[in-house]
A protein has these predicted regions:
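Mature extracellular or lumenal effector domains of secreted proteins
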Residues: 2-179
Length: 179
């Protein structure tokens, strides 16, 4: 099982920096590099075909590492009140605040063999997390339907429904609305 964190990512980078053989997942990077693997930006080629290579931020510490961060909000420096196209393709910067993009998240989670973990921290430093033992986002044709398994953790995602999930219908401000 791979874990995918709710965090954001940069969708632009120089093509010259793509490694010859990008890994298929942050988990594969962690497994090959071991305990000293650093949390940073990496190139992924999820299908191993070099047809759809993109950059992600891999968290190599939380939950034993190997986690792909797909959304991060820290200081409000990135506007999240954007349209559907931005949420489909992604926006922001992997080094700061970002959203990976529904199409990339779908490609990374299409086998549903992933764990979804949401880590939260308030202004007083209080933390909580929610973890689902299965996570996937279906294709555009299926309106990026959210697939979630059983919940564990300190904070349940109030917008998410276990098992059936929901189809993403529109984006309002910083929330993705499910139906």
């Amino acid at each position: 099982m791979h874990c995918l964190f709710l965090c954001f990512l940069s969708i632009t980078a120089a093509l010259g920096s793509i490694p010859e053989l990008p890994a298929r997942s942050c988990w594969e990077i962690k497994a090959s590099e071991g305990e000293d693997t650093i949390s940073k930006k990496y190139w992924l080629d999820q299908l191993g075909t070099r047809e759809y290579v993109f950059e992600v931020f891999c968290d190599q510490k939380t939950s034993s590492g190997g986690c792909t961060v797909f959304q991060r909000r820290v200081d409000g420096s990135v506007d999240f009140f954007l349209d559907w196209t931005d949420y489909k393709h992604g926006f922001g910067n992997l080094s700061g605040e970002f959203w990976l993009g529904l199409e990339k998240i779908h490609r990374l989670t299409s086998d549903h063999n992933n764990v979804r973990r949401v880590d939260l921290e308030d202004f007083e430093g209080n933390t909580a997390y929610a973890e689902y033992n299965m996570f996937g986002v279906m294709s555009r044709e299926n309106k990026y339907k959210l697939i979630l398994g059983a919940y564990s953790g300190k904070k349940k995602c109030s917008a998410c429904k276990e098992s059936g999930g929901g189809k993403i219908s529109k984006v309002e401000g910083t929330q993705i609305l499910l139906r």
